[in-house]
UniProtKB/Swiss-Prot annotation:
Role played: Involved in the glucose/cAMP-signaling pathway. Required for maintaining basal cAMP levels and for producing a glucose-triggered cAMP response.
BP GO terms, sorted: adenylate cyclase-activating glucose-activated G protein-coupled receptor signaling pathway; negative regulation of induction of conjugation with cellular fusion
Major subcellular site: cytoplasm
Domain (MHD2): residue spans on this chain: 981-1097
Domain (MHD1): residue spans on this chain: 567-700
Keywords on record: Cytoplasm, Cytoskeleton, Nucleus, Transducer
PANTHER family per record: ADENYLATE CYCLASE ACTIVATION PROTEIN GIT1
InterPro entries noted in UniProt: C2_domain_sf (IPR035892), Glucose_resp_signaling (IPR052811), Munc13_1 (IPR014770), Munc13_dom-2 (IPR014772)
Cellular compartments annotated: Cytoplasm; Nucleus; Cytoplasm, Cytoskeleton, Microtubule organizing center, Spindle pole body
PROSITE patterns assigned to the protein according to its UniProt record, in alphabetical order: MHD1, MHD2
UniProt protein name: Adenylate cyclase activation protein git1
One GO cellular component, as annotated: cytoplasm
Organism: Schizosaccharomyces pombe (strain 972 / ATCC 24843)
Amino acid sequence: MGFTSVEPPDFFDWTARAIFLLSTLRSRRNAKQIERENALLDQIKELLSIAIIQCHERNIPSIDLPPSFFNYVCEQLPRHPFAKIASSYIDTHTLFFQISISSFLCRFSNCSEDEIRLFKQHQSLDSFLLSLFDLLCSHHFSVEFTSISLIIKSSQWLFYTLSDYAHESLTGVEADITTKFLSTLADTWPEFEEQCTLSKHLFLLGDFSLISYVKVLCGVFNIPNYNAFILSVEDLLPENISFAAVADFQLSKYRAINDNSVLRSDDFSSKAVFDKYVERECYYSENAISKIFQNYPDLAVLFEELQYAEGNNDLLSAILNTNKYTLRPDDCAPYFYRLMDLCLRYCYSQSNEIGTNVLWSMTTSFINIWRIHPGTCCCVVLSIYWPYLEDKLLKFSDLGDIFEYFFSLIHDCDYAIWSVHDEHQFSELLAFYHRRALNDLVEELGSCPRSSDSCRAILDILNNYIFSCPLFLVTPEELEEQYTDFFKKLKEKYGEFFQNLLKKELTGKPESDLEGLRLVGVQLQATYENLKSNFSARIFNQLSVHSFFAEATCHLFLEKLPTITKTYVYSNCKEIPDHILEMINALYQQTRALVACTGYLSSDYPKIYEAFSGTFVYRNLSLIIDKGLANVLQTVLRESFIPKRSRFYSDSTKMILAPLQDCYDFLQKIDWPSSKDANRFYLHLGKLSENYIHYYVDSMYALFIYSTDIPLKAEPLVPDLPVKQLKEKASHFKRHSGDPNFLKLYRESFTLINTVSLVSGWLKMLHQRIDYKILTEKVMHFKDMEVPSATVIISIKMAHLLVTPKAPYSFSVLLQDPESEFCVHTRDVYDELVPNWKETYQMEITNVKRFKLIIYQRNIHTGLETVYGHATLEVDPDKLKQGHGKDVWLDITNKGQILIGLRVLLKRETPNYYCFAQMEYLTVTEVKMLNVLMISLSKFIRNSLRNSGLMDFVRYLDGDENDNAEAETKEKMDELQARCEKEQQSLLAELDDFFYWIYVNLLPKPLFYLLSRLWFGLLETFRDILVPPVTDSTLRRIPLNKRELKMVYSWLQLFYDFFRNFQDIAPFDFLNTDEYKSVMAIKDYYFVKSKDVKRVSS
């Protein structure tokens, strides 16, 4: 084979060395070894780069190998004496020849220097190295040629075969270069065979070593577990790897003894520690081998015969002769499944972990070494975890790392090259895990977790891996069915959650169940808030977990509510203990809080009203008032006119008004679902209290009138007032008073007046207890409630228009509502100065209205009508609620003004309405009673004035014009003076006694009213005595003389001095009024005409 060559003599040495170094890469055991591999790859690239440069310097021409060359190689390779290559091998490894020979020797032989410098990073170099590595580490070579020496020898035969064919089939320079290259490579092959350390050792199954994975597994945990793992090695032995296990343990022992194991002496702190490691490694290997031989007796016999056969102790020969115990390439997937399953079981049994890192390491090794498709590996891994999920040994939320690691293997894998079997199996696995995820999600969400970590992990797996995978092939109908079932199961889970709360909190006793149901509501609200914070985003873009929880549990809670409260709803609240009412109130408040926070539908509020407001509130308010009405009359008849009058309006009034107090107390204990309901309850109480107060006060008013013998003139008393009993009480009082003096009777009736005043004060105090914060809680609702329905009366009165005097125009106004069909037109009015219509229209409104006014002018001569101007009228009934009416001038598009009158008749019912109406009624009643008393006192005083002769000073002339009046004699005046002084003393004594009782017993406000009105009446009486009224009568008054004037003013001074004693209780001066000053001024201007009367000398 001597041929001329132009390439450097060391070119083929470098090439052969690179190939041998590539074979050493097949032993990868740990991270330190991987670092060595990386360094070795760099060394190989450097050697090949040098060879390329040398080729460039020697001007080696390009080589273009014909296709027949590759066909010959493919035909000769299966005829190798040691080869048992499957037919698929020929097609699979054709790429090796294309890249390794054609690309390496030909494509870059004539590169430029710049191209040479870039060659180290060129992808072709990496392709070449990987192709060589593929061939030498393929299943076929690693299994069929089970030692490196056989690989080397087979490679030498292959190179010789290719060289001979190149010499025969090629011509010219191409034949010389190719033949020289292959021949040199074959000749130098044995030299490198001696330098390859792996040729002296067993190399099992192309870089797959059982003991390696044993160490990986045990390295995850700790050294003691390694011992336990080895002692149970029989659990790790699949059906076809027994001989491989023996060989690998022998290899492990051999390397440990020769300091060539995974861990070298420099990896330990001292030589003694390393020796212990070697001793332990040898012990475990021998122990493991013995256990294998126990399980496989025929294998033990075979090894024993081969080991001690005379002249044949070569273990490699024994392996070749026992090829039936080695693993076939087609069995790699079952072996992978078995090993992964054993690994997972071991990890789970030791620490309940799923061994993610270990399984990831083993899977990547199978993909890289055994060339198993990533999809197949992922199918195997997911299949292994299936039974663990089915048996509930694992939770779906624990598989996050598994999906992340293994889906990264197929992330860059083209799904188009997947096998049909893998696609179908992977799709089924994804469908299973999807169903499993939904089931676990139901369990997690149904338990109302405090943390969302588990649920979030499940959702991340679904979103990131399952939904996004193209092989997740589920029809829309199946998905709809699964998610319908998901929501149904979740609702059932929440129902179970609620039922468990009921079992925990409810005991079956009505009283304790009130508190128990409240606690259930508290827990539901807390769980809702927790779910709301943990699951703020919507799941599957359609489910808000907290809303779904509220929908499922609030419905059950509201259904349970009436069954718990029915024991008390139909009972009189007076018969319910206070602590029970407080519990009902607490339950109601919690119910409202739960409904408010969950945003539950208002359509379910009737369930709350059924348990509370609808029956409970209204019925108990009515019961309280009805019970109070039954006691009003008896209290009035029993407590009136008793010696201790002050106790009546303090104790008795409290007793009578206690039902109203109870009603407000009851409403204070009830919380409100909305402002509208609060108004509704207070309005109901307002109507009840109105009837109650009218009955009470009208009873006192009637008793007051009957006791003073003043006829009751068609007073609006309540229909059910017991008049007969009140008259009997008044008659009984008059018969037993012992003194027919009506002043004594009146002073006994002060307590009735005081009571009316006191009732007014109590109502003010009770009205202040209305929870206005509740009424204004929801502003819009409250405003809607407050907007009245009103009847508006619009009067179109007059207008100031800018027209010339005596213009021939008549004017009319069109009033219309643009939002409705309301439209009215006034009559035509012709006025030289100002048109006056004075027309009134009426309509119903419920909110702000804007009316449009159009003023028309019509020529009275021609009949032509045109628009004079426009104006806009805004009517807001809410702003009219105070004044109830006003007049407004509206501008007419800068051409004058029009006067519009507005009045509104409000139809409003509010809590304030009833309170103010009752206050007004009480004030009117009190004033009527005081007026009765004032009129009676005025009559009593006028009788005294009449008895004193003061009324005789009112004298009139006869009908003729003659002055025939006779002067009073001095004796008669002295007698009149004496009688007047006596009557003054008598009246003063009576007033002192009577007004003492007034001062002591009558409340300050009614006392002041009585004094001021009485004083005003007295002033009018004295004015009548002093000055005649202005009338058209022909009768003429005779003026008073000086003595008469003095007597009149002495009476006035007496009353002034007497009433001045009460000035300290008056809020302002009621004596020195304008009326008093005008009466005092009469004496200064007193005169009569001389022609009418004869002046009387003093």
